[in-house]
Amino acid sequence: TACQNHMTHVSQRDMKSTLALAGSNRDELERVLEHYQDDPQKLAAARYLIADMKDNYYLVSDGIDSVHAALVTTSLQEGFLERNRRDRWMAYRYEGTAEKIYDAQTVSAEYLIENIDLAFESWQRYPWGKYYDFEDFCNYLLPYKIGDEKPDNWRRIYTEKFAPVLDSLY
């Protein structure tokens, strides 16, 4: 489609930047592209995701890691964050103390392939998917994260946990 062609053109320029930034992890990103070479739509999605990755990073520091561990433990045990714990997290300042790690330098091919496949599965499985064109899919459903968090398997976790609920709604 015209949208895919436009995105592929834009992605070529940005993808080169991402692949250069990836350094020794470049092979992982190229494996994703090779994996989808026979599926034009998933290949276009992979190109979009990799091109968009050039500015994605997460921060690492002892302070962030300890606060994150406390938040994860709390949310898993209690199902919500107490106000004082949330306020401590929001007040935490890590500027200058954290190391910036670019996703392009660390994400694996397996991680990106799983993310792409699960995003397509959700888009095609549920009736609401027909209201989203490919550009909307790439912008809103495909991304593997929404901020500066470390990439994780959130999509797999949420799919396994909530698919039965979603299936019962449709």
Show the residue positions of the predicted features.
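N-terminal accessory/pre-domain segments preceding catalytic cores
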Residues: Q4-Y170
